[in-house]
A protein has these predicted regions:
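Acidic, proline/glycine-enriched N-terminal capping motif
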Residues: 1-73
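Short amphipathic beta-strand starts and helix->beta connectors
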Residues: 13-20, 61-75, 105-106, 127-136, ...
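Acidic, low-complexity central loop/insert segments
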Residues: 21-26, 31-32, 77-186
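Short, conserved charged micro-motifs
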Residues: 39-44, 94-98, 127-129, 154-163, ...
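Short, conserved active-site entrance elements at the starts or edges of catalytic domains
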Residues: 176, 182-206
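Glycine-rich, small/acidic residue-mixed loop/short-helix segments
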Residues: 204, 209-211, 226-308
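Short, surface-exposed secondary-structure edge patches
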Residues: 215-216
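Structural motif
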Residues: 222-223
């Protein structure tokens, strides 16, 4: 089995019982946009909702990059190194995010580099990988903590030599879905090409997840985001809900949600866990804690798992 095969073919979670904490997981769904150069901090401060300027080397913080209208292009986890800032973002959004930032980067001494090789490992310390191999990315989303390792191309090539030690039955990598499910349970939406530029940060609860700093100063979209914080109120927010009824898949999302009598728009179903039992849905703030709605032409029973 080659390194690439191991990083793209995951064990079936229904037949492989693996611990949810401390399991070594190779994550292809996320990749890295690296920002380097002497103006890196100044450039990112003008583009990100997070306070990149306050980051010490080795620290990580969640954030977002928004359009001038305040719509979220991508959310990210930023990690500062000696030479750069690494933005951990959904893989499918790395090229489009890079293209968006290029028009601003032209005025700064910075370079934007895509890491599209398999470069993200969840819980690498638990897998006993050498810490010199990766950049640690420790971050919190609300009350939940996460750990990942970010590999540059050279480190990825070194990792290929270590992979045989993870191919025995007692030390198999965990399926990627475990890590992604944990992010969903924390309320972190995996944005994609369909949902990018569709939502305001408050709708995605980025203000509650520590991804917006309201004291850092101006950045693209900041005026609209600040107005929502101080003068407005988001009528809908992302909610973690349990589901029962009709089986859905992430491939079919996003889907419109209607009231139980199928008469009024209610919100959108945006992401499911691997077993489709939990979901992230954009729903009214004042939604009852449990009930039913119509989605994909079927009635689904729901129960709120968070109190947003």
């Amino acid at each position: 089995m080659t390194a690439t095969e191991l990083m793209t073919n995951w064990p079936d979670p229904s037949t492989n019982q693996v611990p949810t904490d401390g399991a070594l997981t190779f994550v292809n769904t996320y990749a890295v946009l690296e920002v380097t150069g002497e103006d890196t901090e100044k450039f990112l401060q003008g583009q990100c909702s997070a306070d990149i300027g306050s980051l010490a080397i080795g620290e990580s913080v969640p954030g977002s990059i928004c359009t001038v209208k305040g719509r979220v292009i991508t959310s990210f986890i930023a990690t500062k190194t000696n030479e750069s800032v690494l933005l951990l973002i959904p893989r499918v959004l790395v090229p489009t995010t890079k293209e968006y930032l290029k028009k601003y980067a032209a005025f700064f001494k910075v370079s934007l580099n895509q890491w599209l090789h398999p470069c993200v490992i969840a819980n690498p310390k638990s897998g006993q990988l050498p810490e010199s191999l990766y950049v640690s990315c420790n971050f919190r989303l609300g009350e939940q903590g996460f750990h990942a390792g970010l590999l540059d191309q050279a480190s990825y090539q070194k990792l290929a030599d270590l992979l045989p030690s993870y191919q025995d039955k007692e030390n198999q990598p965990a399926p990627e879905s475990i890590w992604l499910d944990h992010l969903l349970e924390a309320g972190w939406l995996l944005l994609n090409n369909k949902t990018s530029e569709e939502y305001l940060p408050h709708q995605l609860n980025l203000d509650l997840l520590g991804a917006i700093n309201f004291k850092k100063g101006c950045y693209t979209g900041q005026e609209i985001i600040a107005r929502m914080e101080y003068r407005g109120k988001s009528k809908k927010r992302l909610k973690v809900i349990s589901l029962s009824g009709h089986q859905l898949t992430n491939e079919s999302l996003p889907l419109d949600i209607k009231t139980a009598d199928d008469s009024q728009p209610l919100g959108e179903l945006l992401q499911l866990t691997s077993n489709a039992k939990l979901a992230l849905a954009l729903l009214p703030v004042e939604l009852p804690s449990e009930g039913s709605f119509i989605c994909d032409g079927e009635t689904l029973e729901y129960a709120l798992q968070n109190n947003v």
